[in-house]
Amino acid sequence: CRGIDETGATDYSWKRKRAALHGGIDMPAPFGTPMLAAASGTVVAIFIGERSARGTQIVLRHGPRDTGIPLWIYSLYAHCDSMPDLEIGQRVKVGQNLGPTGNTGINPKLGYDAGRRRPAIHFAVLYATSPDYTVHRGHVIPKDGYWMDPNALYKGRLPLDSAAMKALPKAEKAVPIPVALDDGTLRPADTKFVWPYACWRD
């Protein structure tokens, strides 16, 4: 399976004109590699992102029935190579192809696309107790929403907040990651979540 090369909460101040932390995880993949829906849900935003460091991106909202978690969860897939063939309000299934991996997005310091970013997915996850959200300047903002470590999603249960995750005993921090294989098979077959890239059989 494809791994993470930039973790969440990494200091991004050197990349920005201000203090900043990385709000997700990055996983490099060749151009065109399908980005997969981490869970079943509804498309709530698609941004072309011409003036955004995230470039072209998709945001899904996952309700409690989708995940089995009593919260509203939002997953974000950024740096798509092209606009996805999806519509706002469309339902997607866990493991569904959302769009091709690319390297879209501007260099925040230069203010334009320098074309040097390696192709990768920027995968971010937020959670909220309310289904309400707003869209503002290329961002989906959940009401009373919180960022979370995307890896915590794969626990499939509460708690999800970073402080609680940090406080877990070391033995409980390892999370088995359910996946979609490159032939579309889910492992385990009844999983509600998958890694946002397909894995390949040995």
Where do the model's predicted regions map?
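Conserved, short, structured surface segments that act as functional micro-motifs
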Residues: 58-59, 90-169
